[in-house]
Amino acid sequence: MEYFSNPSIINLFRQCTSLVSLPDISKWNISNVKDMSCIFDGSNSLISLPDISKWDISKVSNLSYLFSKCESLVSIPDISIWNTSNVKDMTGMFYECNSLIYLPDISKWNISNATDICYMFYECKSLISLPDISKWNTSNVRDMNNLFDGCKSLISLPNISKWDISKCKVEKKEKCFIIVLCY
């Protein structure tokens, strides 16, 4: 088992534009990692990911642009059991995953400490549906602009009318409630 003592594994496979697949990284011990931003960002030829569902991300505070621009990914491993309770930044996590049709059931993620979820599903053009994220605790989110912008294949959205948007930036309040621009 590979152990990462460094609290950051940012940009690990970033811009590996010719990379089609990865070796088995499922047994990596990342329990000490705090920053996972941009790990696969721009690896636009990746067609699949190894099973990363058992990664212990309980100390991670930054997941921004994690799968961003993985334009050839059709699905993401089942990351539904990830402990996201310490994550503050989820900006652009699935940004421009153009071929992604479905997401794992992320409805039970604890995002109560998240402050930024803007562009999370931005330009996921093939995404047909979303898990029921209506029960996400968004009380600390300050920026959720363009959350679903460009998700032109979405048939419906979960009922997010009860999300707490009281801490969203005032200058972005009109875009804060994110149902804008799903074309």
Regions picked out by a protein language model, each given a short descriptive name:
Residues M1-Y183:
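Negatively charged
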